[in-house]
Amino acid sequence: KGIDFDNDLTKVAKMYMVMIDDGHTGIWTSNALIPLGELTKNTRGTIMEEGADIIMTNPPFGSKGKVKDQNILSEYDFGFAWKKDKDTGEFEKGKLLAGKKGGGQVPDILFIERCLSLLKKGGRIGIVLPDGDLTNQNTEFVRAWLKDKAQIVAVGSLPQETFRPFGAGIK
């Protein structure tokens, strides 16, 4: 099962499923980051009722820009600014990132949260992310959030050439 924003890619995925005799249902064209209630009833029901044992994803990143839609950002913890308390070292949730010049959130960060929300308890995620999501100082809140919500079992690196045309280093 899967969701992709690109209609051509969903057609290719459905055709591939037919070729390997796996049917052609369970692939939908949609923005996977929109609030789950806005997905079609068929898509929403399948995803929300069953959950996923395994999620494999390569969310958009690199030069794709930020998500600035308040409707989308408000659905996510990562749609808000996070500030580290100097005394406690804990992160505090601040204002919605939309509306400010340069505001918004990169989609790969939002996809981390979306994937965890769709996963069954005990499920696993394989996700391709830019190096900085797990290493940059300005994404420390992401690591803190992940530490609280999930267990990172492994981080691997791919050769720099893998995504060079897209302008991003990856993990």
Residue ranges and their predicted role:
Residues L33-P35, T162-P165:
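A short acidic, often aromatic-flanked loop/helix-cap motif at beta-alpha or helix-coil junctions
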Residues F5, Y16, F61, F78-F80, ...:
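Phenylalanine-focused residue identity feature
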Residues F91-F163, I170:
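Conserved Class I SAM-dependent methyltransferase catalytic core
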Residues K1-T57, G62-K66, P130-G132, F141-V142, ...:
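Conserved S-adenosyl-L-methionine
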Residues K66, Q70, R164-K171:
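Flexible, glycine-/basic-rich loop-and-beta segments that form/coincide
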Residues F61-L110:
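Mobile active-site "lid"/loop adjacent to the S-adenosyl-L-methionine
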Residues I3, E38, F80, K100-G103, ...:
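Intrinsically disordered, low-complexity regions
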